[in-house]
Amino acid sequence: MSQFARLLHLADSALPTGSFAYSYGLESSLTFGLLTTETEFRAYLYSFLQQAVGFELPFITAAAQANNITFSTLLLEYDAQLLTPALHQASLTQGKNWLKLLTTFYPEAGLAELGRELTQQALPAHFGPLFGLSLSKSGFALPDIQAVYLHLALRDQLSAAIRLGFIGPMAGHRLQHDFYEIFESLLDSVDIRPYTEASRCTLLLDVAQMFHDNLYSRLFQN
């Protein structure tokens, strides 16, 4: 029970990792008219989660099972595939904050040493891989790590939509509840793809994320 409570704590939106500052292309998608209805937003969310399963989760899964040597290679591979500058910077910022928090929460997990090694080797401390490795070292099971990451991805998108005024809080939380029904089918496909075959499959999302810097007025950093 205590481990479950700790997992809920790590999934708390108030945890200061910086995720509240990023919309991952949602703000520009709304501004440029790519999304105008709730039906389109549902399709967008499904595509967003599919991309998380196809790209982030293979890295997270591999990181949770990695040793120091393979983790270094994994980090460099992830860094090479994250081509959108705003996403790249957001990942590094969140990774740094996340590792700092987990080092404080779980000093016995050896995360302080991991942080020093990343600095000494000048390795990019990306959020996704560090999320998987740090939670694994802290004693959490792989299925829980995968499910929590997908929950965070969904929660942050819906939170951004609410803050942008596209949907109301009640509608947003109803959508979040509805999407939990498809988590199992999405997660079933995670383990069949190694991180060397991970891919970003929704190009329009990447384009929207790249155009974010062109917004005249914006609430989010990406």
Whereabouts are the PLM-identified features?
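Metal- and O2-centered redox machinery and metal/ROS homeostasis
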Residues: 1-222
